[in-house]
Curated annotation (Swiss-Prot):
Record key words, sorted: Ribonucleoprotein, Ribosomal protein
Gene: rpl21e
Disulfide bonds: none
The keyword Transferase is assigned to this record: no
Name of this chain's protein: Large ribosomal subunit protein eL21
């Protein structure tokens, strides 16, 4: 039988939560607002499927370019070029630098 290559394939450990982190994230994370030029880390939250960018961007750092409804357009460097990804605030963390 042919192996499926879905959106979440090969993410057995990448989209796994530690026991103390299980369940829904706090509401303040979903209501977080970022402004243009903010540096953010893409950290996927497996308990929220909506607005999740592709798992290959997990751990990348980018710059917020614009807001699209509830989501944000983030420019991330992938290899030698920049890519724009759309992600909800649950999957973004503010960079401390």
């Amino acid at each position: 039988m042919q192996k499926s290559e879905g959106f979440r394939s090969k993410t057995r450990y990448k989209l796994q939560k530690h026991p103390r982190q299980k369940g829904m994230a706090p509401l303040t994370r979903a209501l977080k607002c970022y402004t243009e030029g903010d540096r953010v880390h893409v950290v996927l939250d497996p308990s929220v499927q909506k607005g999740m960018p592709h798992p290959k961007f997990h751990g990348k750092t980018g710059v917020v370019v614009a807001q699209r409804g509830r989501s944000f357009l983030v420019r991330v460097k992938d290899g030698g070029k920049y890519k724009d990804i759309i992600a909800r605030p649950q999957h973004l963390r503010e960079s401390k630098l």
